[in-house]
Design a protein with these regions (language model features):
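Conserved SAM/AdoMet-binding glycine-rich loop
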Residues: 41, 299-455
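Structured alpha-helical segments in the cores of large, soluble enzyme domains
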Residues: 26, 142-145, 149-152, 171, ...
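Flexible loop/turn segments at secondary-structure boundaries
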Residues: 46-49, 78-81, 114-116, 149-152, ...
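Hydrophobic alpha-helical scaffolding
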Residues: 48, 109, 161-164, 230-234, ...
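Acidic, low-complexity intrinsically disordered segments
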Residues: 1-30, 35-36, 42-46, 56-60, ...
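Single conserved hydrophobic/aromatic residue that forms the stacking wall/gate
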Residues: 470-482
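Core structural elements
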Residues: 146, 269, 448-458
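Short secondary-structure boundary/capping segments
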Residues: 55, 87, 123, 157-162, ...
Length: 482
């Protein structure tokens, strides 16, 4: 494979944050002897992509296969994209600084809708034809995955295949098919046909998209163009999640990234059923890692990475049946080491005095709660089964235990929303701040901090609200932003 480093290195002195483009980070795996090379791409800058837990997991599982190498690539900052084009340098991988177009397969994660144009920029910068039907035998297979792959049709013209669902088992299995057939000299079309037979894999070129009326009558939005293809694509599920280690050797970046800490996934799935939440629908059923697994992963991960903060990640971490035991044991193991424990997804109705003390650990950071809506009526509509009393009780417990910073997350534009619901956000936030203040000793109130975030509701595929579209041409009421 072509090594672009001699051409890239002279450009780094003028680049913003040049460490974004350096290889050989601590924990980086490079397998030059592999006979099949796969590049995992996050369509945004290194700081965002390297913090992505899915990318870390999938690079590890592919690299664990003998003869397969997984490398990483990220979309450079806009100024660097311009520089690469001016110098005629295509997008490259981090590990070997090789052009993406020279890999056997390129996987692009689809984290959110606003990354769609970044996907096209990634392909263009890599010199890979944008449209799947324009690619030839020498081009890599371009596969998509991630949250937006659950609604693949908007992206279908640009991808050869999609991995729908969790990728720990599906991705290596699909790549093994590609590897075997490429070694046999199979044509691109034959490889895609074989991939379509694998559970959880969708090949758009082998299906026809049905119009709405036709789809309702047939019971499916897609029609196979060949016999033997599944009418519905079922998501892949990693059934071995509970037994798998919560931490595996990971890359410690040279430069600061978002969520720059040790991340240990303790729980996958959510049983709460909020009607707007795609992740809660996608990652069912709920699966837990044991307390022993989690604690061992935290202790080992902190020792091997040097981080002083650990995040126990999931969609709803305080719903773990052993969360109290986990936090108690981690606090004991990290006593005196200055380690901060972060539990980013905290349910208001399961956060009390005991939980506040356990989460505090050696350092007290910030707490994040998500009432989502400003009134109880709207919370009931979206099936967010928490009350104002739950919020106030959680704040009382946390701030009496010594916390001084809090974030509240809301959404605007939800179905059935009225102006009263919008005003309710401001009212609830003010009353929440008053409770924080009342629970804090007067001499410490100057350090109180509350931030309120309001995200715009976006209908997500595979959720009860997926068809709750906003018709811009027919506004029902004004949206005031100040």
């Amino acid at each position: 494979m072509t090594d672009l480093w001699p051409r890239l290195e002279p450009l780094l002195a003028a680049a913003e944050r040049p460490a974004r483009y350096l290889n050989h980070e601590f924990g980086c795996v490079y397998k030059p002897e592999a006979d099949f090379r796969f590049c995992m791409v996050y369509p945004d800058t290194y700081e965002l992509g390297q913090a992505n837990q899915a990318l870390r997991i999938l690079v590890n599982v592919v690299n664990a296969v003998d003869g397969m190498a997984a490398e990483r690539a990220f979309l450079p900052a806009p100024a660097m994209c311009d520089t690469l084009r001016a110098e005629g340098i295509p997008l490259f991988s981090i590990e070997s600084c090789a052009p993406l177009a020279e890999f056997d397969a390129v996987g692009i994660t689809l984290p959110h809708e606003l990354a769609a144009t970044n996907v096209l920029e990634t392909l263009d910068l890599a010199g890979i034809p944008l449209h799947a039907d324009e690619r030839v035998e020498s081009d890599p297979l371009v596969v998509g995955g991630g949250p937006c792959a659950y609604n693949p049709e908007p992206y279908a013209p640009f991808f050869d295949a999609f991995s729908i669902g969790e990728g720990e088992e599906a991705l290596p299995r699909g790549l093994a098919v590609v590897r075997r057939l490429r070694a046999e000299g199979a044509a691109r079309a034959d490889i895609l046909r074989a991939l379509a037979d694998e559970p959880g894999w969708y090949v758009p070129s082998l299906y026809r998209w049905r119009a709405e009326d036709e789809a309702q009558e047939a019971g499916s939005w897609i029609e196979p163009l060949e016999e033997g293809l599944p009418l519905r694509i079922e998501k892949s599920l990693f059934e071995g999640f509970a037994e798998s280690p919560g931490w595996e050797p990971c890359i410690v970046p040279f430069t600061e990234v978002v969520h720059d800490r040790l991340n240990v996934e303790i729980l996958r799935g959510c049983a709460r059923g909020c009607r707007f939440c795609q992740a809660g629908m996608m990652y069912r059923p709920v699966r837990e890692r044991s307390a022993d697994n989690v604690v061992e992963s935290v202790v080992q991960g902190l020792a091997e990475t040097g981080y002083d903060e650990v995040s126990l990640t999931s969609l709803s971490s305080t719903d773990h049946s052993q969360i109290a035991s986990i936090l108690t044991r981690i606090n004991r193991a990290c006593d005196g080491k200055g380690v901060r424990i972060s539990v980013p997804s905290q349910r208001l109705d399961s956060f009390g005095v005991d939980m506040a003390e356990l989460v505090a650990g050696q350092k007290k950071g910030g707490l994040t709660f998500a009432p989502e809506a400003g009134t109880q009526r709207l919370r009931d509509v979206i099936n967010k089964n928490v009350t104002e009393d739950d919020l106030f009780g959680a704040l009382d417990a946390a701030f009496k235990a010594g916390w001084r910073r809090c974030k509240l997350y809301f959404m605007i534009g939800l179905p059935t929303e009225t102006d009263d619901d919008i005003k309710g956000i401001a009212s609830l936030a003010q009353r929440a701040y008053d409770r924080m203040k009342a629970a804090t000793p007067p001499e410490q109130r100057g350090s109180l901090r509350m931030s309120v975030s309001c995200a715009l509701f976006v209908p997500k595929a595979q959720t009860p609200f997926q068809l709750s579209l906003i018709h811009i041409s027919e506004p029902t009421r004004p949206l005031y932003i100040s």
